Amino acid sequence: MNTGIIDLFDNHVDSIPTILPHQLATLDYLVRTIIDENRSVLLFHIMGSGKTIIALLFALIASRFKKVHILVPNINILKIFNYNMGVAMNLFNDEFIAENIFIHSTTSFYSLNYNDNVINYNGLSRYNNSIFIVDEAHNIFGNNTGELMTVIKNKNKIPFLLLSGSPITNTPNTLGHIIDLMSEETIDFGEIISRGKKVIQTLLNERGVNVLKDLLKGRISYYEMPDKDLPTIRYHGRKFLDTRVVYCHMSKLQERDYMITRRQLCYHEMFDKNMYNVSMAVLGQLNLMNNLDTLFQEQDKELYPNLKINNGVLYGEELVTLNISSKFKYFINRIQTLNGKHFIYFSNSTYGGLVIKYIMLSNGYSEYNGSQGTNPHMINGKPKTFAIVTSKMKSSLEDLLDVYNSPENDDGSQLMFLFSSNIMSESYTLKEVRHIWFMTIPDTFSQYNQILGRSIRKFSYVDISEPVNVYLLAAVYSDFNDEVTSLNDYTQDELINVLPFDIKKLLYLKFKTKETNRIYSILQEMSETYSLPPHPSIVKVLLGELVRQFFYNNSRIKYNDAKLLKMVTSVIKNKEDARNYIDDIVNGHFFVSNKVFDKSLLYKYENDIITVPFRLSYEPFVWGVNFRKEYNVVSSP
């Protein structure tokens, strides 16, 4: 990161369309390392710091020299990248070749490069003289995409830009794959990773630390956004190590079926989906079925005396008394007195989706664009609504998030409760969420942070003085009240095995976190920083941001204004060239956002430079406006 670029900005205004100083400083580093030196980079920027815009700005610059292939996890994130590409183009004040940029989902990329599940090696020549940008890079390994990336790296000898807010998912194995992909050498995992009998005993050994420092030297960019522009986080529940957890004591009914499931079905309890299910809610015989879809077709099948299922529909008094779920009993009781929007994470999409829907409906909460709840709760004269997001409803996710994030929904009057499975753990942004709930314990520390990072990020809150509430729910035995204050108290298996599943899961998470934090601190220390004049390839982009910042505070200045000239000459040292640049932006009517006039264009008026507000107007028959800095096309019948 070029800290000299950050020093050019003073009191940067973030509330307008903008490129942040750290993004420009990182862009300089990427151009020098990937384009000039042909070396791969790991962009390890913590969630919410704007990795996507950095990557797309870099793609626009790189398109002048090479083809750029951007790989994203799924079609929904591809839509986000396509939208953000438009944002990046509008902020980009230089030439680029759009035809050289290709954005693929992993599915389409697989189809493009495999024939009958075999890599089409002859077709890989299309990636010669290319650069690959991989979003959520920690997720591509252990599948065909990771295999293909390794083949392309070895065959085509091209650099990669790997984006990740959490380069370690479950164990250091992921980091080992990243090192292998970024370096010119083949990594022997047996030499750098030590393995014990348990997953939590998978560690990066001293040899691995040395390999990491040696092979990735100069290839790491670490950044974490300052939290000064974020709301405070208020964790609820009792103290649990370095966080807080809400103990939800199970009823005798739930505890009985919980223990039956644990004894009969869970040979490897920490990884068994059945324990996720019964920790959320018990459903009698449903807990004993490996194929839930089969039982969902049953007609009026009794699960408990006061709970039945009919063609996949749950009904009965138990959905209100909630002896089947200590977590939902706490949740339903708590939300009645809370204001604002809720984001609720759960991992068991099929089972959890069924439980959530009918508990919410039975307790007076209506399904968004669906069934109305019993005796519905109201807000502003409208029912309080919920939606459940799983991988099965990808097609409507974008529209749903538009409603959830709209300013009109800041109070949750359009959509108050958003339940989501793992599909929402990465890449999406949620606005004005005041309550974050964990109905199931995440598998990894990185996943936990990613879920929080969907909401708690820069620009997601208008009022940062109001805290965000986090509820990490754990189903525990009716008599369980242990204080968990130190991991050292739980080093023996016999002490851990008697704990409730959720508590074991949390301890497991914390054990892995120790190793994750150790490696992250090494990566942070390796992050490349320097102070140099800006790279020639980013000069116009940098000047564009400086001009936007200048004219936010200045509506009218003299054409030969000394402050403007000084600002431009901080980048373009030659005064004549600096004056020519000022002529170009004024005669080209550069777009700015002014604090008085809002969206404006620069004009020369007599001996002054003025900001002239504008707006797009159109006749009723116009059905499409494509507005970019290069052109303005109006399409009509």
Curated annotation (Swiss-Prot):
Coiled coil: none annotated. GO terms for molecular function: ATP binding; DNA binding; helicase activity; hydrolase activity. A motif (DEXH box) lies at residues 135-138. ATP binds at H45, I46, M47, G48, S49, G50, K51, T52. CDD domains: SF2_C. SUPFAM superfamilies: P-loop containing nucleoside triphosphate hydrolases (SSF52540). It is found in: Virion. InterPro entries: DNA/RNA_helicase_DEAH_CS (IPR002464), Helicase/UvrB_N (IPR006935), Helicase_ATP-bd (IPR014001), Helicase_C-like (IPR001650), P-loop_NTPase (IPR027417). Keywords: Activator, ATP-binding, DNA-binding, Helicase, Hydrolase, Nucleotide-binding, Transcription, Transcription regulation, Virion. Residues 32-185 form the Helicase ATP-binding domain. Pfam families: Helicase_C, ResIII. GO terms for cellular component: virion component. Its EC number is 3.6.4.-. Residues 327-507 form the Helicase C-terminal domain. The keyword Transcription regulation applies. Belongs to the helicase family. VETF subfamily. Heterodimer of a 70 kDa and a 82 kDa subunit. Part of the early transcription complex composed of ETF, RAP94/OPG109, and the DNA-directed RNA polymerase. Acts with RNA polymerase to initiate transcription from early gene promoters. Is recruited by the RPO-associated protein of 94 kDa RAP94/OPG109 to form the early transcription complex, which also contains the core RNA polymerase. ETF heterodimer binds to early gene promoters. This is Early transcription factor 70 kDa subunit. The gene is OPG118.
